[in-house]
Amino acid sequence: MERLKIVIITGLSGSGKSTALAALEDAGFFCVDNLPVALLPKFLELQNQTVSEVTRFAFVMDLREKGFVSRFENVFKDLEDQGYAFEIIFLESDEDTLIRRYSETRRQHPLSKDKGLLEGIRLEKQVLEPLRSIAHRVVDSSNLNVHQLKAMIQEMGAQKNERKSIQISVLSFGFKYGIPRGADLVMDVRFLPNPYFVPELKNLTGLQAPVQEFVLEKPVTQEFLKKFMDLLDFLAPRYQKEGKAYLTVAVGCTGGKHRSVSVAGIVYEHLKGLFSNVSLSHRDIER
């Protein structure tokens, strides 16, 4: 049986599953939306009986299929027993974001026909919790725009099916917008000198040289970076040794535009020299 890369995209309605599927299609995956979970084994069986150069597949499966929740566990287990390896990506967003998105699109939530929107959202969370618990990756899209979500999903899809190296995501954020869900390590850099209070730097970001110089050249920053890099050098290989596939390192300042962005860039460059699968994103830089 030829080794296939199979990605299952699922999660809460309105959390960005269609955007995620489009991202993988742009990355070269053969994509199917709303495939009944019971048809997945037959689809893969036919694929292995066919001469084809297509080896990467992505499927969106969710509550639009009435029997999805009752069937997915047995189907996924049977596929694993047959030797298939697949990755489940579960997308979610906070309630306020989902409500806003539904208000903007004027679409009906699949579980809100006889209930209010908020009740439908909460019921879906409850129903999908067993699937969320077995997902390989949980992505909170609450504070991601379309381009950021696409980039994140494509980064995941670009990895090899058999990961020999841990995938590390370095993320800058602003504490005023909340700590990123799913972050494994959170570093608060609000103790560093703040460029926000320097008039000529206030409207710049940590991607620009004047801000980077202001933040990174301070003695306290240099001392902090040395200690933080030592900690990461100690922890990351041990996470990998324990079989952890993903590690998210979140660096936060007040607004997520200056200090955290500058420091996250240094952390990214450092880790990129040690691990093959490292990505960098700035959650709140455009706020």
Swiss-Prot record:
Residues annotated for GTP binding in this entry: 62-65
Keywords: ATP-binding, GTP-binding, Nucleotide-binding
Annotated binding of ATP, by residue: 11-18
Transmembrane region(s): none
Single GO MF descriptor: ATP binding
InterPro entries: P-loop_NTPase, RapZ-like, RapZ-like_N, RapZ_C
One Pfam family in the UniProt entry: RapZ-like_N
Protein function: Displays ATPase and GTPase activities.
Family membership: Belongs to the RapZ-like family.
Protein name, per record: Nucleotide-binding protein Dalk_1358
